[in-house]
Amino acid sequence: MTRIAVCLLFAALAGCKDQRSEPAPPARYEAVKAPAASASRWCDNSFVGAAPRLTLPPLAAPAAGRGQASLPAGKRVWLNLWATWCQPCLREMPLLLKWQTDLRKDGVEVEVLLLSLDEDGPVLEKFLAEHKEFASAKIGRAASQRDYEQWVSSYVKDPGTPIPLHLLASADGNLRCVRGGSLREGDYPAAKAALR
């Protein structure tokens, strides 16, 4: 019996832990902060301070019923270089036009201009007639491939840089960002930062 009592006593003592309470977990766990949207990482070329002035290349006559695209004075500009034969360009255009609205809602007034590199004016006109979603978009067309290449070489090292190509300018008309390649939904914060 004594043996049983001793075993029970040891079992009871072993089950008793130090009654000191463990520190409570922190009320708020530290989270890893997401990196801030970085225009300099998003842009292939970004400019701070002295920057080239954004201009348009010589433009072909506008499509029927459209005014000539021009750079608005005193407004931020997003110039998108595209073509009707460029599938990545066509996929990103609805997103770009949506972002124009979103940017305005976020207090970033920007004018989006679509500069077509289609050499055949009737092809562009047919495309615009079939795609009513671009009815309100400001669209211009480069007058010639040679004019375009001379003009774009002011902003990119290789005039053969593939499209889509995006040139973002501040309200003073100076280039802030050059970005090659398609837009993705997750690019919005960096694009917004590039326009600020």
Positions of the model-derived regions?
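Short, internal strand/loop/helix patches
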Residues: 128-163
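Thiol-/selenol-based redox modules, centered on thioredoxin-like
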Residues: 161-196
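A short beta-strand-turn-helix
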Residues: 46-77, 101-102
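Short pre-active-site segment immediately N-terminal to redox-active cysteine/selenocysteine motifs
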Residues: 75-77, 82-85, 162
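N-terminal targeting signals for export/organelle localization
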Residues: 2-59, 177, 196
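Conserved redox-active cysteine motifs that mediate thiol-disulfide chemistry
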Residues: 81-98
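Solvent-exposed loop/turn segments at secondary-structure junctions
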Residues: 83-88, 117-122, 144-146, 174, ...
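Thiol-based oxidoreductase modules, predominantly thioredoxin-like and allied folds used
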Residues: 108-123, 135-146
